[in-house]
């Protein structure tokens, strides 16, 4: 079960939790395709405005399968930097996962994801993050991100995440 919450500062300012791992955005979530993020919790417009933080009680455990992964030596990295939004037509982490065999044939042993943290809007390179611990829902679910990492590790591909602390 997921719950939404906000902090009320000085009785008038509503803000999301800066440490939240998921947020609801009244302006941008409506543009997220249900095939990319199925069952996205609806924004509680009848109760509030601005960003709402989300937490989940007893989330399902992810079953990591690439348990013997070892990262490549730093001096042997062949890094492919990509922006999830532009790498495929769908612009989702699931679509990137579907292209891992192709990247592997190129000799890639590390993928650097351009920023994937939540940022203002859905059309940006992500260098304007606003919630550093929340992966961008426009690219997919938390499980989809974990599946991507697990599938990379099955192929001995490291995952590097580009972060910007503005």
Predicted regions and their residues:
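Hydrophobic faces of well-ordered beta-strands that scaffold small-molecule active sites
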Residues: 78-82, 111-113, 159-161
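Short amphipathic alpha-helices and their capping/turn segments at secondary-structure boundaries
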Residues: 67-68, 97-107
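The feature marks proteins involved in alpha-glucan
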Residues: 1-79
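Extracellular/periplasmic catalytic domains that process cell-envelope and extracellular macromolecules
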Residues: 71-76, 104-106, 153-154
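Conserved beta-strand->loop/alpha-helix structural units within folded catalytic cores of enzymes
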Residues: 103, 146-164
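Aromatic-lined carbohydrate-binding surfaces of glycoside hydrolases
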Residues: 119, 163-166
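The substrate-binding groove and active-site-proximal loops of carbohydrate-active enzymes
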Residues: 80-94, 128-142, 158
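Aromatic-lined carbohydrate-binding/catalytic grooves of carbohydrate-active enzymes
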Residues: 102-146
